Structures are given as structure tokens and as C-alpha cells.
Amino acid sequence: MAAWGRRRLGPGSSGGSARERVSLSATDCYIVHEIYNGENAQDQFEYELEQALEAQYKYIVIEPTRIGDETARWITVGNCLHKTAVLAGTACLFTPLALPLDYSHYISLPAGVLSLACCTLYGISWQFDPCCKYQVEYDAYKLSRLPLHTLTSSTPVVLVRKDDLHRKRLHNTIALAALVYCVKKIYELYAV
């Protein structure tokens, strides 16, 4: 695998620097290097990224621009679905408190359906993807702790593993509450 550019960084490796405050162990950081060896280099980059995601490294640095951009976009879409589910569900639940009851269902029902749709789409497409456990790191201080000076790419994408259990619980709970509200409101509107 070393021929494909696979390198683990840890204490004592050539990737460390004296200015780092915290040394990273071999299980903390994985770098997908942009080394083209043959026709299927892109497939090899994707394979390495999959292996790194499944191995649950704390940091994954992606040098190949195309795969890094695709991964960052995929994570951004997942974040957008999560935030939309939470915000639309919150709007669904709190609109009846802010608007007159005669008009609140015009906003709360579509918001509830949107929340449920986003939560369902997230659950189907992102929940079991190992990428959903990662976020793109933009914080300069945290990035300075990583051995980025050893890279050949000037714009790598850095992923950091974060626990998403609370986030999933939040949007599932809000979407479920929005569903209950919508069913109750539809029953009241059409059964009476």
C-alpha cells in the first residue's frame, strides 16, 4: 500500500513538527496522498478514503482535489438537510404560538412536511454513510496542529470525526413531533 501513497502519521514520524502542541498518534490522522500511479489512481483515492472513513480516524486529510471537493459537498448537503429538518420542524411547532390559530396551519403544515421529508431523506441517504460522522475542518488553530506541511496539495480538505448521536436525536425528535402535530392538525381540519 505504500506505493499508493498511504502514510500514517504519528509520534516520531517525519510528519511531525516541533511547533505542534499535541502529538498525534498513528490512529489519529490519515492522509490520502495525491500520487498518480497508473490509470485507476482516482479509484485508488476513493478506496483509500473509504478505508480511512471505516477505520474511524480522528482526522482525514484528502489531497486529491476532486475527491476532497466531492466529499466536502456531500457533507455540506447532509448538514443542510439536518438544519432544514430542525428549523422547519421548529417553525412547525412554534408557529401556532405566534400566529392566530386560523392562519397558523398555512405555515406550520408545510413546515412540518418539509421537516419530515428532510429527516427521512437524511435517514435514507446519510445515516449509514461513514461520511456523516465527519465534518470539514476550517479552524486555522486546529489545522495548525496537523502535519499539513508534508502535503503536496495547497488546498487539502481536512475532515474531523465528530459524534453525531445528539444531532440525529435532535432532528429525529423534532421531525417526529412535527409529524404528530401535522397529523393532529389535518385530523382537526378535515374530520370536523
Swiss-Prot record:
Main location: mitochondrion
GO cellular component, one term: mitochondrion
Keyword match Mitochondrion: yes
Transmembrane segments: 84-100, 107-124
Cellular location(s): Mitochondrion inner membrane
Region of interest (Disordered), residue spans: 1-20
UniProt entry tagged with the keyword Transmembrane: yes
Pfam families xrefs: Mito_morph_reg
Gene Ontology terms: biological process: inner mitochondrial membrane organization; mitochondrion organization
Protein task: Plays a role in mitochondrial morphogenesis.
Entry similarity comment: Belongs to the TMEM11 family.
Protein name listed in UniProt: Transmembrane protein 11, mitochondrial
